[in-house]
Curated annotation (Swiss-Prot):
Protein name per its UniProtKB record: Histidinol-phosphate aminotransferase
GO BP: L-histidine biosynthetic process
HAMAP family: HisC_aminotrans_2 (MF_01023)
Gene: hisC
Organism (species): Clostridium botulinum (strain Kyoto / Type A2)
Pathway: Amino-acid biosynthesis; L-histidine biosynthesis; L-histidine from 5-phospho-alpha-D-ribose 1-diphosphate: step 7/9
């Protein structure tokens, strides 16, 4: 610990990312990346963008990308905010809408960046305990004085919350912002975007990292009524006016436009997810129902940590969380069909030896 650090720096416990191995032979099922490459139209846009214009600053307002996203969701450009990945959008949203003197609410088992943001901005928070099946009790979010954050589908469980439940939470918190983090919504869930016109307190946050295969370009966005987006822009422009570079913006536009490729890839992930769930069930695993591009699994006979270590020895990476209530679960990203066949082969051999 350095004597030059501020008290905030000394006190904060940073978020820990999933492992990013240098060994290309490893089957990477630990960070929920898309197993398929970006759209060919995206790759062509990137190639075309590598020209003299890179000497110029990008559009600080990301107008072209905002228009593309607005058209896709039948919104106005003023209802779209762009950030450097949904993590940045979430961070700026915590700062924009939550007050230190009020308590915000999010689930006890959810995206572990939320408490980091809360601690960084000195926000008080309450953890709403998920039910035994990892579903949300919406009563825990009733009258959350400072606001609420819902991950839908949830991470790391993959559990999906219905739009009716989202509506109830919004109505119970009409004077506070409710953020719905939809990083994984495209793998079987129904987005809350359709509710924006009726709920001025709703902010929907999405990313192009998962379903659009652009994790390496860091593009996220928020959707909400104009008043919310105006607030986000005030905070963004107090940090960094240029959140998205020229190449990322052009790539994102093509990723949004290529609906056929998007649907093709998400459908393949969903089919492979269903196949993997079925195969794991045959060897005694219990799988939490998932609407994400990952599954959350456990076994009554074998310890999750032991399986995690053995899989890593076999060059297969999954995610293990040594935390209360989920220490005997593994989160497994859905790879290509070929990758998941290898995963199944390895895990069968491992449990036969344990």
């Amino acid at each position: 610990m350095s004597k030059y650090w501020s008290n905030i720096t000394k006190d904060i416990e940073p978020y820990v990312c999933g492992e990013q191995p240098k060994n290309k032979k490893i089957i990477k099922l630990n960070t929920n990346e898309n197993p398929y490459p970006p759209s060919p139209k995206v790759l062509q846009a990137i190639e075309n963008a590598a020209k003299d214009d890179l000497r110029l600053y990008p559009d600080p307002n990301c107008d072209a990308l905002r228009k593309t996203i607005a058209n896709y969701y039948n919104l106005s450009k003023e209802e779209v905010f762009i950030g450097n990945g949904s993590d940045e959008v979430l961070s700026l949203s915590f700062l924009t809408f939550f007050n230190p003197e009020e308590t915000i609410v999010f689930s006890d088992i959810s995206y572990s960046f939320y408490p980091v943001y809360a601690n960084l901005y000195k926000l008080d928070y309450k953890l709403a305990k998920l039910k035994e099946d990892f579903s949300i009790d919406i009563n825990d979010f009733k009258n959350a004085r400072g606001g609420a954050v819902i991950t839908n589908p949830n991470a790391p469980t993959g559990v999906y919350l219905s739009l009716d439940s989202i509506k109830q939470i919004l109505e119970d918190n009409i004077n506070n912002v409710v953020m719905v983090d939809e990083a994984y919504i495209d793998f079987g869930g129904e987005s809350s975007v359709s509710l924006i016109k009726d709920y001025p307190n709703l902010l929907v946050i999405q990313t192009l990292s998962k379903s659009r295969s652009l994790a390496g370009m860091r593009i996220g966005f928020a959707l909400g009524q104009k008043e919310l987006i105006e607030g986000l822009n005030r905070i963004k422009n107090s940090f960094n006016s240029y959140t998205i570079d020229r190449i990322s913006s052009l790539a994102a536009i093509e990723a949004i436009k290529d609906e056929e490729y998007f649907k093709e890839c998400t459908l393949k992930v969903i089919k492979t997810r269903n196949w993997t769930i079925n195969e794991l069930g045959k060897i005694g695993f219990k799988i939490i129902p998932s609407k994400a591009n990952f599954i959350f699994i456990t076994h009554d006979t074998y310890q999750a940590e032991d399986i995690f270590i053995k899989l890593k020895d076999e060059n297969v990476l999954v995610r293990y969380f040594n935390k209360d209530r989920i220490s005997n679960y593994l989160r497994v990203s859905i790879g290509s069909k070929e990758e998941m066949e290898i995963f199944m082969d390895k895990i069968k051999k491992i449990i036969n030896k344990l």
